[in-house]
């Protein structure tokens, strides 16, 4: 997303450091910045690891982090609390598809020394020291499940969805201290900071784990809306319920659960996916209306039984190249990904992929990176040609992929 560019954050941080002190401190800051390298974190949800890969080129693997070094301690605490145990098992047997969800989202700290991770089944956010693999701090979220996160443009704050508590909590990324929180709709999911850092957008997706998936039962899915808040006061600025906007253009049978979304570089348009739909929609922010709908091809081999689609997601994952001319869409249940021209909405080649669950952008902006959760690999697709570039094996059930910065000589924690 254009609003979440860690490679830009490091440049800003370095520039501020260089102007804050004398020659010695400036040189120190410059050396510190130069000692970091841009990478990608890949969260392997079902095995509790995060792979670190190159952010461009061959996307080769650099190292791996165990994001659940405290697993025994956490499991013991869950087993000692009947309510926590019930939720833990419910996550495993519903949204986890029979697996525990150990890592959802990840970001690096501004100094590149730590990885901050949200862990759904453990209902927390932890900071892990990249040098030692040990936990720096742990923040238990409200309720019983942690979900998507977002990092502020200056890299100092991280917002995490506490999905069973219907709220977002904002933390100091260095200390884990809670700075504020705000209420959302049912089951908050995606979070996006605007690029000026003034606002946070949260998308609540409702109860995606039930089998009442026919449009006639849509009302059972809960209160699904976008919440926009002031990123400094955490006060509500606006609520956007896509139900009204969908109905206005005749899409009464569409779900209003906004899934992955991405802004244009100027943030005038939002492109978003909704539950059960093979495609995406364009929303004009100023006009407050849906302006275009793009339906993407169905895979003939995909069952039309909605209850077989993972967590109500037919398509889940969307990103945009830095110039805002191309979109990349993960056609999750249809087993492909494709690059779409934003002006014409014409899709390119359908690149075969196994349950792609996320889409992001390479460090140089040339490629779309998708996580193939069904094949345990990430795949790069050239924005210019729409063709596959390379696939790289990772861990069990990769989902979120994020740009990050780590020490240049890092190859893994010393404890591994």
Stretch-by-stretch model annotation:
Residues 1-4, 58-60:
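Short amphipathic alpha-helical segments with coiled-coil-like heptad repeat character
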Residues 2-12:
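Bacterial N-terminal signal peptides that target proteins for export
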Residues 9-11, 22, 318:
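General helical structural elements
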Residues 13-17:
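Sec-dependent N-terminal signal peptides
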Residues 18-26:
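C-terminal segment of classical bacterial N-terminal signal peptides
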Residues 26-416:
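Predominantly soluble domains enriched in secretory-pathway, periplasmic, or organellar proteins
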